[in-house]
From Swiss-Prot:
Record protein name field: Monooxygenase cfoF
Gene: cfoF
Annotated coiled-coil segments of the chain: none
Primary role: Monooxygenase; part of the gene cluster that mediates the biosynthesis of chlorflavonin, a fungal flavonoid with acetolactate synthase inhibitory activity. Within the pathway, cfoF is responsible for the hydroxylation of the flavonoid skeleton at position C3. The pathway begins with the PKS-NRPS hybrid synthetase cfoA that uses benzoic acid or p-hydroxybenzoic acid as a starter unit with four rounds of chain elongation using malonyl-CoA to form the chalcone skeleton.
GO MF entries: FAD binding; monooxygenase activity
Record organism: Aspergillus candidus
């Protein structure tokens, strides 16, 4: 780094301490180095530091099959060993399974890891990945403020950006903070995006999803799913995702076509949770046991219902002093299976381009050239998965030769350059 860098003496605010926001902050500090004046980077997040089981209780895939995947990013950040230690599966691709409604399973397959990566994919609870990134940020001295949301945005007369900060607990306005660059990583329902791109809204995929985390004390996981994860496919337009979250917990997510999206309740009650379980049992009657057992053993505090939403990515040529990364730019439905990988790479790449470029516009333009096509590939693949998982004309060959599982999980992503 030279001493004449355009970011010297500048203030950067990151809205959102999720995967994308923390990957950005960590790599920016790493790339910036110690031999120039330090950057002033502050991260705000509307959530508390503690875990919300309904939002953080599931696990996700981190891939290491290509250079631009999540595990490679985490290795570059020095966090790979911690992620592998925290994973519930360290050989996730070979454990991926497609079951039919009677639990006949597809053969396993594998994909080589990229370079010297120790594995091609892991499954890790979202809460564990979040904690690893938070602790890394705290250890690096990155300033993170919890329960503070970035509510409003304006361009100031001096060319900087003004951000109104609100206490997420009591709703009180804290202050208006000025900065030279705002990195919006505030999720699929980004408030910053609503202000700057009010027509760029989430689109309903046609799928509703409900599920939770079933508990099996003493390792009494049903043999059908033990040490596996994947999808139950039927020929009834309904499917179910299954994945371990711990030695005793299994996340399940039932999905089906529904004409209009349903919103989750404003407040959760025991009665509503039980009604969701009853609906899940009714909708999944076509799936043989142990699925009913899985539903009945679900921890009520982990139950969820959500509409499958997504949106296309966008570039920043008409925006000034603000960059959207992760879900705030390109939201994926859960069936995309690649959201965390793309978010990690977004954060990492933006930091790298800001440190390498000679001006902010060049950095953001190069970021767009890499991030937008990457997100579009994941979005297109997500729509293919949604269609194949909810067909009424199931291809039985995928249960005999393993090609169905390979196509469903990896598709064309492994061959992307």
């Amino acid at each position: 780094m030279t001493r004449e860098h355009f970011l010297e003496g500048k203030d950067i605010v990151v809205a959102g301490a999720g995967v994308a926001g923390l990957a950005f902050a960590l790599n920016l500090q790493r790339q910036w180095g110690d031999n120039v004046p330090p950057l002033r980077v502050v991260v705000y997040d509307r959530d508390k530091r503690e875990v919300d089981l309904r939002r953080q209780g599931y696990s996700q895939t981190l891939s290491g099959i290509k250079e631009d995947t999540g595990l490679v990013v985490l290795k570059q950040l020095g966090l790979l060993d911690k992620v592998i230690d925290g994973a519930v599966m360290t050989d996730a691709i070979s454990k991926f399974t497609i079951w039919d409604k009677d639990w006949n399973a597809s053969p396993s397959f594998n994909v080589p890891a990229y370079g010297d990566m120790p594995t091609s994919a892991v499954r890790i609870p979202r809460r564990v990945l979040r904690t690893i990134l938070i602790e890394a940020a705290e250890a690096a001295g990155i300033e993170v403020h919890w329960s503070v949301s970035c509510e409003d945005f304006e361009y100031l007369d001096d060319g900087r950006v003004g951000i109104r900060l609100r206490n997420a607990d009591d709703g009180e306005i804290i202050e208006t903070r000025a900065c030279d660059l705002l990195v919006a990583a505030d999720g699929a329902n980004s408030k910053i995006r609503t202000i700057l791109r009010p027509d760029d809204t989430l689109q309903y995929t046609g799928l509703m999803m409900m599920g939770g985390v079933a508990e099996f004390p003493h390792g009494a996981v049903p043999d059908h799913i033990r040490d596996k994860w994947g999808m139950v496919l039927t020929d009834q337009g309904i499917s179910c995702f299954l994945s371990p979250t711990s030695q005793m917990g299994y996340h399940w997510g039932l999905s089906w076509w529904e004409q209009s999206p349903r919103a989750p309740p404003a407040t959760w009650s025991i009665e509503y949770t039980q009604s969701l379980k009853s609906e899940a049992l009714r909708r999944s009657r076509v799936i043989a046991d142990p699925f009913a057992t899985i539903v009945k053993r679900t921890d009520p505090s982990t139950m969820f219902i959500m509409a499958g939403m997504d949106k296309r990515p966008f570039s920043h040529e008409h925006l000034r002093k603000v960059v959207f990364i992760g879900d705030s730019n390109h939201a994926f439905s859960p069936l995309a299976g690649n959201g965390a990988n793309v978010a990690l790479k977004d954060g990492y790449d933006l930091a790298e381009q800001l440190c390498k470029a000679s001006c902010m516009d060049d950095a953001i333009s190069q970021f767009d050239r890499e991030s937008v096509p990457r997100a579009l590939r994941t979005l297109d693949r997500s729509h293919e998965r949604i269609a194949s998982a909810h067909t009424t004309q199931l291809d039985r060959d995928q249960f005999t030769d393993g090609s169905g599982a390979n196509d469903f999980l990896v598709g064309q992503q492994h061959s992307d350059k």
